[in-house]
C-alpha cells in the first residue's frame, strides 16, 4: 500500500497539481483505512463520491451560468406557467389579437329595430332625456360632420356606464353576499363591447392633440359624475344610458348616410373589425358602422330594460340578465 501512495504522489506532482495531489492522497488514505476495516465496497463508493465533488460543483456553476445567459431571451411569465395559447382562425391562420379571442367574436344582429324610442313618462325619464339632448347639442356643435371623431368621442363616453354599473353591482354582491342575477357580467360585457368600438374607430381616425385632451377631460368628469349618479339612482342612470344609446344609433345612421352619399369614403374595414364581428374579408367601413349601430341598439334595449325593472320597484337580480346580448 505504501507503494500505491508513492505512485499516487508521483503522478500528482508530475501532473502539475499540488491541489490534486492532496486530494488523491487523502482519497487513497481513506481507501486504505476502509480496506483495513474490511469495508472494500463502501470504500470504493466513498472514493467515487470524493472524486466527483469538484465535477458536481462545476456542473452546478455551469447550469447557473447558462440560466443567467438565457434569462435575457426568456419570457418572464413562463416561470408562472402563463403562456399564450396557440389559437388559430377557422381558416387555419394564426390568431393575431391578444385583446380578444375567437370565442369572443360574434355576428352582430343587424336586423334589430334601430328606430325604437322610449317615450319619457316619469320625472326621472324626462330629466335623463333632456340631459342627453343637451349633451348631443354640444357634441354636434364641436364635431359637426366629422363623423369619425364624433364616434370616437362617443365611444369613449359610452364605455364608462357599463363599467361603473358592473363595478358597483360587484361590490354590492360582495357586501350583501348575494348573486347579481348575471347583471355584473352583462354590464361588463357592454363596457368591453363599447371599448372594442373605440379600438376600431382609432384604426380609422387619428385624433389630434386637442381632441385627445378633450377625451381625457370628458372621461374623467363623466366617470366620476356617473359614479355618483348611479349610487343615487340606478333607475335614472340606466334610463340616461338608454337615451344616450338612442343618440348613438342616430349618430351612426347619419354616418351611414354620409358614406352612401359619398361624403365619407367607404374605406376597407380594419382587420380587428373583420375578426371581432366575423365580417367578410372584403368588408368596408359601411359594414363596420352597420354592426356598431346594431350593437348600440342592443345596449339601448338592455339599459331601458334595466330601468324598467327599477321602475317596478324590483332589483336587477330579480330579472334575467341579457348575457351575451351585444
UniProtKB/Swiss-Prot annotation:
Per the UniProt record, which residue ranges are transmembrane? 151-171, 213-233
Catalysed reactions, as listed in the record: 2 a ubiquinol + O2 = 2 a ubiquinone + 2 H2O
How does the cofactor bind to this protein, according to its record? Binds 2 iron ions per subunit.
GO molecular-function terms, A-Z = alternative oxidase activity; metal ion binding; superoxide-generating NADPH oxidase activity; ubiquinol:oxygen oxidoreductase activity
EC top class named in words? oxidoreductase
- What positions does the entry give for Fe cation 1 binding? 155, 194, 197, 296
Residues engaged in binding Fe cation 2? 194, 245, 296, 299
For activity, the cofactor(s) needed are:
Fe cation
This entry carries the following GO cellular component terms, namely: mitochondrial inner membrane; mitochondrion
- What UniProt keywords apply to this chain's record, in alphabetical order? Disulfide bond, Electron transport, Iron, Membrane, Metal-binding, Mitochondrion, Mitochondrion inner membrane, Oxidoreductase, Respiratory chain, Transit peptide, Transmembrane, Transmembrane helix, Transport
| Keyword Oxidoreductase attributed | yes
The protein's Enzyme Commission number: 1.10.3.11
GO annotation terms (biological process): alternative respiration
The way this protein sits in the membrane is described as: Multi-pass membrane protein
The record's InterPro entries line, in alphabetical order, gives: AOX, AOX_sf
Q: Which compartments does it reside in?
A: Mitochondrion inner membrane
Primary location: mitochondrion
**Record-stated family:** Belongs to the alternative oxidase family.
- How does the record describe its quaternary structure? Homodimer; disulfide-linked.
Function, as annotated, reads: Catalyzes the cyanide-resistant oxidation of ubiquinol and the reduction of molecular oxygen to water, but does not translocate protons and consequently is not linked to oxidative phosphorylation. May increase respiration when the cytochrome respiratory pathway is restricted, or in response to low temperatures.
Q: What is this protein called?
A: Alternative oxidase 3, mitochondrial
What is the organism field in this record? Glycine max
